[in-house]
UniProtKB/Swiss-Prot annotation:
This is Guanylate kinase. It comes from the Bacteria. Essential for recycling GMP and indirectly, cGMP. Belongs to the guanylate kinase family. It comes from Ralstonia nicotianae (strain ATCC BAA-1114 / GMI1000) (Ralstonia solanacearum). PANTHER family: GUANYLATE KINASE (PTHR23117:SF13), GUANYLATE KINASE-RELATED (PTHR23117). Residues 20-198 form the Guanylate kinase-like domain. It catalyses: GMP + ATP = GDP + ADP.
Length: 221
């Protein structure tokens, strides 16, 4: 989700010992996060993208349930008040949120879940899922970041300036991540992202959750 003040909707922390893993990809706008994530999903059918809810208007080409679950402000607030969100934030006058129930259902079923999220949202998710894997995507330079924002043609010049100003404070939180990928050469960055995902799947607790019966049989606790 875009960066702004995030709010935790769940206060009870748990260790993520579900069969499925939870990945969070964080980046400033223009770093190439969505392009990398889409390529990863196309190559790895074992991961499902968590689709955020938002009250903003759809952009050209966006579809409900694919890029976002679009809803009215009243619908959003009703879901929030029922405790259906893991975290939520107000960004530039629009609301965004992550579904808690859906994520837990997927991971219990053994499916890996990936969140495209801002650093503040990642902090809130860690409060619920201590073992979530955070991956921070960085641009190769500030000049490259500005060029990418201009070339994608989605924002007015004043919005681009605002995004560049925000990028500095966002990237200052890269040390909080478990892994950092510099997206200079796309193919190399994608390979690194796939490596991170595979490494996380091989962690002891992740393997134990996926192969619980085997670990019991082998006497491993």
């Amino acid at each position: 989700m875009p960066s702004s003040q995030a709010h935790s909707a769940v206060d009870t922390p748990i260790e993520n010992h579900f069969p499925g893993s939870l990945f969070m990809v964080v980046a400033p706008s223009g770093a190439g996060k969505s392009t990398l994530v889409n390529a990863l999903l196309a190559q790895d059918p074992s991961i499902r993208l968590s689709v955020s809810a938002t009250t903003r208007k759809p952009r050209p080409g966006e579809q409900h349930g694919r890029e976002y679950n679009f809803m009215t402000v009243d619908e959003f607030k009703a879901c929030r008040d029922r405790g259906e969100f893991l975290e939520w934030a107000e960004v530039h006058g629009n609301y965004y949120a992550t579904s808690r129930v859906w994520i837990e259902e997927q991971m219990r079923a053994g499916t890996d879940v990936l969140l495209e999220i801002d650093w503040q949202g990642a902090q809130q998710v860690h409060r619920r899922f201590a073992n979530a894997v955070e991956i921070f995507i960085l641009p190769p330079s500030l000049t490259a970041l500005e060029d990418r924002l201009k070339k994608r043609g989605q924002d007015e010049p004043n919005v681009i300036v605002r995004r560049l100003l925000a990028a500095g404070s966002e990237m200052a939180h890269a040390p909080e991540a478990d892994y950092v990928i510099i997206n200079e050469v796309f193919e190399a960055a994608l390979a690194e992202l796939r490596t991170v995902v595979q490494a996380a799947r091989l962690r002891y607790m992740a393997q134990k959750a996926r192969h619980a019966e085997l670990f019991v049989e082998l006497g491993i606790h």
